[in-house]
Amino acid sequence: MDGQALRKVERSRSCSQERKEGYSKDMVTDFDEKHDEYLILLQQRNRILKHLKAKDPVQLRLEHLEQGFSVYVNGANSELKTSPRKAVHTDFSRSASQAEGSQDYGRRTLFREAEEVLRRSSRTAPGKVQRRGWHQKSVQIRTEAGSRLHIEPPLDCSEDFESQEDVIGKHEDATGEHTQELRKGLGLSTSLQTQEDGSSDEYDSIEEDVLSETETEDPVLPVHNRDECPLPSHDAVQKDVPKDQELEGRHPQATDTLVVMEFNPASKGNKMDRILSAKRKENAEVFIPSKPDSVLNPQPPAVFPEQERACSRSGSRRDRPLSATRKAYAAEDREEDASAVLKAIQVENEALQQVFLSHDPELHTSPQQDTKEPPAKSWSSLLKAKEDIPELLPATPVTTDPELCRAAAGAKAVSQAMDGMSPLGSRQQHKLVGVLQTMESDTTHLSQVAIPTEKPVPNSEEKWKARVDEIEDAIYVTMEILSNWGNASWVGLTEVQFFDLNNIKLYVSPHDVDIRNAVLPGELGCLVNRDLVSKKDPPVWTCPFHPPLQLYFIIHNMRQLRDFGLTMIKVRNYWTADGDLDIGAKNVKLYVNKSLIFDGVLEKGGGEAPSDCTIPVDLQRERNESSDKALSTGWKESKGALKMAALSDARELGLSCSQPAESLDMTVSSQGDFLGEKVNSTSGLKNSLSKLQEDVRLLATPASMGDGPSVPSSSSPGKCLPLEEEPSLIQQLESLRGRKIPEPTGKTPHWLQPSLAGMGKKQTVRKPKPLWLSPEKDLEQKSRFPSEDVMGDTPGEVETREKGPRREQGRTSSWNVITEERAPKAFSKACGDDLDIFSQLPNRDRPASGRRALKKEASSSHGDDRPASKEDTQASQTLPWLQWYGEQEHALHASWDSLTAFDRAHRGRISALEPQGDILDEFLKQQRSSRHEEFPAPCREEEPEPSTEMGGDSDFKIPVLPYGQHLVIDIKSTWGDRHYVGLNGIEIFSSSGEPVQISSITADPPDINILPAYGKDPRVVSNLIDGVNRTQDDMHVWLAPFTPGMTHTISIEFTHPCQVALIRIWNYNKSRIHSFRGVKDITMLLDTQCIFEGEIAKASGTLMGAPEHFGDTILFTMDEDILEAIFCLDDTFDMDAESLCGLQPEEALRRPSTADGEGQDERPFTQAGLGAQDQVPGLELQTSPPVSEVTTPEPGIFYGLCLRLNLTASWGDLHYIGLTGLEVVGKDGEALPIQPHQLSASPRDLNDLPEYNDDSRTLDKLIDGMNITTEDEHMWLIPFSPGLDHVVMIHFDRAQSIAGLRLWNYNKSPEDTYRGVKIAHVSLDGLCVSPAEGFLIRKGPGNCHFDFAQEILFGDYLQTRLPPAPTRRLDAKSLERASMDYEAPLMPCGFIFQFQLLSSWGDPYYIGLTGLELYDEHGERIPLSQNNIAAFPDSVNALEGVCGDVRTPDKLIDQVNDTSDGRHMWLAPILPGLVNRVYVIFDLPTTVSMIKLWNYTKTPQRGVKEFGLLVDDLLVYNGILAMVSHLVGGILPTCEPTVPHHTILFAEDTDFCHQEKHAIISKPEEDQDIQMMNENQVITTSRRKPGTADPALRPKTCIREKETSRRWRC
């Protein structure tokens, strides 16, 4: 027992020991396996984390784009983007987990832990708060899972967990690998949204997320002082600096390879513009912010910027670790960074100092006491306009401290610049460097131009002598009124005229007249631009009198004549028929260009006309007058005010006037200002000013910015133009307006920049430029401002000419922003405007322009004859800074230059360049008169000379009722067409009110038939008096070739001499584009007396509108009795209001050509419309005399045995010809019996052809009796050979009396009707009974709507037919067919007149008419019978179940039209898919001159509304027939009411027109189909017609014949 127990115990111990050993072995094995498995899982976890942290190229590029930002992802816009930016990370973890095996719970746990770490790290940023005052200390935050995390700032302040080596390597990748990509993507971008698109939609979403989440404020980063210890993490980064500096010479952050991007600070919730500072290029354009931003003072950060720059993604980016957001190299800028930036700035400053130290030493001696404002404001303005940054330091004396400017070396400047840059943040440093780079590029242009300024400046006396021989641009006349003839409060004048050396009156623009010392200026334009064409006398100039009153006149040399001058001034004193003549001026002084030429008394007005005072001008005295007399007391008195105005102007612009020349001149525009212009310093200006105050004779050449010694090759081309060369458009405008149109201020394009070699050679060998690219004329000779000499040369007080409400603000050019040539006279305009504003503000009504035109214009120029004050100089120097605000001005002027260049190279045929009401009107008007004077017509001497009262000044007064017999109209110009001139008509009325009888009318040139390509054009001069004036028909207009400079006259001879009371000119009105061929400037002579000279209004080109829309009416009397008599006899006003409202435009026959030909002077071809002589010859065959060789006792009846028909022509088919039926009409009108054996034909039928065997269209079908058909089994068809005979023979058994033929033409289908017979020659027993040209056979209709048989009676051709009388174009008057939509042929001629009735006035089931009448060419009504009228559907009897209705088509011609009885009307059903038709059929071609229609009266809604008229299937008219209104019966019950008829008029006969003028159909407004759509979806639909009516709902109607009782008619 015990032994067994022991053995059991031992056995159990051994087993347990074995189990323990096995267990321990199992434990060791299990631990090893678990450990290995753990290591494997850990390795997989690390791999997953590493893969998740890996960045694709898109992320890497985005991080490089974000470098330099401070991005807050959970700011105001953190939740705007909720879609995941990239789902690849979470998907990857899921896919990786599945790859390792979804059954492994531990691995999935590791994957979730890895993702949880990443998720937690993306949510550690605070919420939506402004991180302005973060403190660098430890914080505790609760994660989303609930645990707390203790966060401390790392020692190295790194933003990620990567080693410095990784940072170095990836920084090298960033700076080297992606440099070109960054340049390409951001070099010229102005916002992040314009970056280069990514390679996938994923990148687009990333970019949008960045844009939406980075809207919050980015505080300025401070630069650490030198005593601060840099962080260790900078060491690795700093190693990259020498490499970059070897390449670029600057710190990497200041180089071209690194793009700095930054958001502007937000201000009170307002979003700010994003601005990119990209790589600087040589000719980069100045960036202009898209909208102004306010500059705020950002709060400096209190902690390291890592916390500020660390951006945690929003919920859409949870899969991205925080460390991957951006790899910033350091927490803040180290001393090495700042020193590198300062070193780069030092390089910029040294380059600038070398440029300016090479100039005259006077540049650096400007005293500091001249500074009116601290330099900080100017620098802020400079950089704000350049980059719109938050704010710069209070003072940045890099280039603004005068001590730096005086230093010969740059050491002190560099040290002070470094001290001034130290408070700046890195971004501000980058931006300042960018500004300096732009300034350097500008300075490069300055240095190229400023070299010639070292030449000695000639004194003003030499320049004055040089100007004497040059072209004088303008003459300045001053009139000083000292007293009047007795009126206590008013003074006035009638007119002032100026005459040149050839005794020709000079044109003076109303805008070139100004006044001084007057509260109300009055209508100054009346002094020089009196409108003598108006019906009443124009107003006379008056104004309140406060002596001395000064009037200023500027007379421009528009033609650039060298002998430009005045010989005489004519002054007409105040005079009105019923006015106070004491208002006239008495004691007057007159100055011409500083010279007193008159000091005396003007005669008082009296009698029937104002008195003239002619004042001669002493030319020698005027030209030799010294400039010493230029200074006036007015200039001295206004000097102080001008200083104040200029200073206020500069302050208004927000620019400082204290910068020395370096800071101002380096931003001068380089496009138009460096073409031969010089830039001097402000210091030189001040020295010159001190001399000018001692010696006023040097006023003409102060050494200011611009008019120093210029390069001869550059300035000389701009002095004057040859006489034979036309000045450019801009130069002509400058001459007219008296002001300089500036050059654009942007960078000069590389194709316009002068080469460096050329600049080094002082520009003496520069290739000449085209005229439109040449430098503008010198301001002193070319565009002297209207107020220059006035201000300096006239006695008394002086003020600018631009004064009063008459000067439109809109005419002030906004191009005057730039002081384009920096000339000394770039100041008078400024002072003039400012003095005008400040001293006369209550008297002006000048609105402030939104573009600040007044302020910009105020600094454009100064006059020669006044010294420039210091404030004025500074104000003018500040204007180059406006180029940053003037980008649109650049584009505007560039467009103008392009148009000018195009105008030089391409001359269009129609050059209507005159916007009415603009100053261009005056300019072009003067140009026309100048051209006509320069090129007098050689034939002008043969014309009768005007009366002597015209004189040389072309001045006249419209006479009252001029008397004469021979009227000559001299056409000076057209409305733009340079090749043709035309008119529609001329109407002349005498003093008795009757139209003047005209015996003859001629023209020179007569018409366009004198040209080689013409000969029968209907547009002849006799059309002018045919009475058809409101027209677009070529048959009623006159057109002649026009050659500028030649004579174009119209001569009209009256039957008897008479007094002319009214002349109406109807201008050329063919179309809107052709209306430019109308006359514009004309002169009228009646028996050599000028009765009119002026402009005729251009026609509208349509047929709508009042008579004034078609030309002009000239009245020669205001007598009411005469005008009333004219009104009664004037057909123009004899139209009722309905007809006027119904005028519709007519379509042109063909579109005019608008393209230029090969030669600019080639005259384009013009062609008239289809006239009466162009009708189809076949339609006029009835006019030929009959050719009949058979004479019988009974006219028209022929007796014979054998009848022969020869078919010689078809209606168009070249291969077949045929007929449907044939009958021979006997003596009694009955058809003669014909048997098949009596018929023979050659060819017999189609079976004669080899390809036909058993064709059914045989000869016997002609007499089978089935004639009204469209089945060809009942027709005859044979092959047709043009030119050969196709004969049908009928052999009667015995001789028959034959009166004619009855034919049914081939009618298989509308297309096959062209196989029908057109011409048939008929002979009987060998004798011809048809005309020589044969009988004209009517073409078949192609349907069976009516019996289309044609009866040819031989007797109708026996009478000799006279051709229709020619239209009397000299005395016939008619009204234009107002309702036509096209050019209708005159009096259409044809066989079948078809009325297509398209719609009714509302009834969907029935349509009807009461009656119709047709009139022939003689105005006689054409008798119609039942054989002539047909309709389809025929009547209501066509309906099922309706019969016996009396409203059949024959009721249309029963001549009972004025009735409401339905038994005399026609009514037909409207059937679905069919158009109701009414046919009027003639057997002979019939000419119709007029058609009268009576609409359906019984039920007006069943009347015809829309209809069309076709003549032989050709549409000749369409319109709308008015509905019959309520009819009023007569006094007696038996009296029928009068039903109004409607007329379609084709004739021009006077009787027709006057008789039917109130019945002509006028086209009212039509209903239209309207669809309103929104985003391609139909919203509403309005249709003019209801849907197809249901035939089942058709109402029954029927009127049967009944015995009529006796009815009385009255």
Curated annotation (Swiss-Prot):
A Pfam family hit: DUF4457
Positions in coiled-coil regions: 330-354
Transmembrane segments: none
Residue stretches of biased makeup (Acidic residues): 198-218
UniProt KW keywords: Cell projection, Coiled coil, Cytoplasm, Cytoskeleton, Phosphoprotein
Residue spans of biased composition, Polar residues class: 188-197
Feature: compositional bias, Low complexity: 704-718
Record note on disruption phenotype: Knockout mice frequently display brain-specific defects, resulting in a noncommunicating (obstructive) hydrocephalus.
Location(s) in or outside the cell: Cytoplasm, Cytoskeleton, Cilium axoneme; Cytoplasm, Cytoskeleton, Cilium basal body; Cytoplasm, Cytoskeleton
Residues where Phosphoserine is found: 658, 688
Cellular component, GO, one term: extracellular region
GO terms for biological process, alphabetical: cerebrospinal fluid circulation
Domain of life of the organism encoding this protein: Eukaryota
Region of interest (Disordered), ranges: 1-24, 84-105, 118-137, 173-236, 305-333, 702-722, 760-821, 836-875, 927-951
Biased composition (Basic and acidic residues): 173-184, 306-321, 775-787, 798-810, 855-873, 927-941
Function per UniProt: May influence the stability of microtubules (MT), possibly through interaction with the MT-severing katanin complex.
Subunit structure of this chain's protein: Interacts with microtubules. Interacts with 4 subunits of the katanin complex: KATNA1, KATNAL1, KATNB1 and KATNBL1.
Protein name, as recorded: Katanin-interacting protein
Gene: Katnip
